[in-house]
Amino acid sequence: MSMLKMDSHIHSEYSPDSNSKIDDILERARQENIDIIAISDHNTVDGTSEVIRKTRNTDILAIPSIEISSTQGHILGFGCEENIPKDLSPQDTIDRIHDSGGLAIIPHPYCFYRHGLLHNTDYKDLKIDAIETKNARFIVGYCNRKAKKLSKKENIPALGASDAHYWKFVGDCFSLIDAEKDIDSVLKAIVKGKVEAHGKGTSNILLAKYLFEKNILMKL
């Protein structure tokens, strides 16, 4: 079985802080030779529903996902097809994810300025399934290094993801996963730790350019 390339944390125009079209995201994913993607929009599955429709019978597998705002920070409901309420406690959010058949993955765990859950909460109090140890949206990399250290110490499965809010950043960080190209196999492989985090940080110059252009466009 060959390793598959996956970007598990991408935002689309259904997130309030992104204007990326699903078609542009898919085009970029193909340019980056990505096999598996997940649109993980803030508190809505509208984007993930669209990408699943558009990738049926194609070369890309779309995993349903959502980034949920708990009271203490963000949590990915990876594999969740339905909305999960925001502003629940972290463990209540995780319980809802598990009840939906998904995995609870902590994005940018220690990034305090981006609602990193483990900046506010001890992971030992939570039934998490995996954490991001390579999130492409960083400035100096300290938060990623801290997450990687925790993953190794506590044997928590580690993922890489672009957290792209602009389609050109898709694939900057990614995972290589030892799985068949179907949703159930991917979820099981993550739980078993058959996944590796890879990639680089999104260029801060390009990120600043995107934020400037986005701010201008939103005022038009």
Q: Which residue stretches match the model-derived regions?
A:
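Charged catalytic cores and adjacent phosphate/nucleic-acid-binding surfaces used
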Residues: 1-27, 32-34, 45-52, 57-64, ...
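Short beta-strand/loop segments at the ligand-binding rim of alpha/beta enzyme cores
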Residues: 3, 97-105
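Aromatic-lined carbohydrate-recognition surfaces of secreted/lumenal glycan-active proteins
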Residues: 105-113
